[in-house]
Amino acid sequence: AFLSGGMDSRWIVEILSKFPISIDTINFAPFGTKDQVFGKLASIALSTSHMEYPGENLSFADRLVDSINLFELSKVHHNGISRLRTIWSGDGGSVGVGHVYLTKEILDEARQSGLDCAAKKIVVSQKYHVPMKLVREKYRHIFSAIYKSIHEELNLYASLEPGRACHLFFMMNDQRRHLFSHYENIHKSRIDFFLPFFDSRMVLNILKSPVDGFLYHRFYNEVFNRFAEPIRSVPWQSYPGHIKCPFSYSENLRDQWADGWMDNNARKKEKILLCRQGFVALKKILFRKTIIHKPYLMASLLLSSTNLRSYDYFIETAIKLINIETSDIFFDGSPLT
């Protein structure tokens, strides 16, 4: 099973520990992060055989696959047969049970002003927008469809309690697509997951329950309070704005959100790679009609690559839009003219 410094994988391993079995756990977080340190402390408390991944400067997905490959080598599991490998994973717990992305402000808006106002609040809180300076003026009207499409989907759930309707929006969009990339490449990794938080029975029970008790990981914290010692007192990594972990820990540990998962050197390399990808994307549209405002993108790439300013989000968005354009499919399904 994966065992990180968060709540999702810990809940799974805590339940597995109640059975008369030996448990192997894997943590592929970079050293010096809360994910790595808290995961190790949890493994000690739960008496698992724990492996930490020593590799450096790889992406999240690459570290995941590489850590499992290394684990199998260390356990001498290879018998010459190519096979599908399975591992318990806490994916889906944050949105499904912790209700990440859902806020009291969104709930209040949905209940007091209606789902149309809740859609606007979701767009703002989740930054579901495209920087308008990136888009040529004649195409900017297209992106008003973001709010419209969210509003239309929320209306599909109008028969539900408004707060739960908003949660279902995140379930049907973020949660449903969460593992898309992994399963698109499962033929390469040959790794499958046991996913308790995607179990239809668990999801149904959550959706039938009042939403307020789950907000900001409230239900999660109630569950953790019922754990036996010593695992109950091991710190965990909390989402920004959610109920904080009550246990003290070193302030020098890197936080997944505020500080980033990688260290400074790895982040610098990621930034260089992003700028390179941005220049490659710009080259694709240099001599073709496009929705992208090319001079602004060029200026952003130059400023970012020279570390004068950071336009990472801007460049990431541009790359995604250019990939859509150069696949000859535009937002209404027809080629761009």
Each model region followed by its residue ranges:
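ATP-dependent adenylate-handling active sites, centered on carboxylate activation for C-N bond formation
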Residues: A1-G163, H182-I231, C245, Y249, ...
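Core structural elements
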Residues: H167-H182
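Prokaryotic Sec-type signal peptides and long signal-anchor helices
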Residues: N173, K283, I291, A318, ...
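Short linear sequence motifs
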Residues: K121, M132, R136, G163, ...
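C-terminal non-catalytic accessory extensions
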Residues: A299-T337
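PAPS-dependent sulfotransferase catalytic core
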Residues: E229-D312
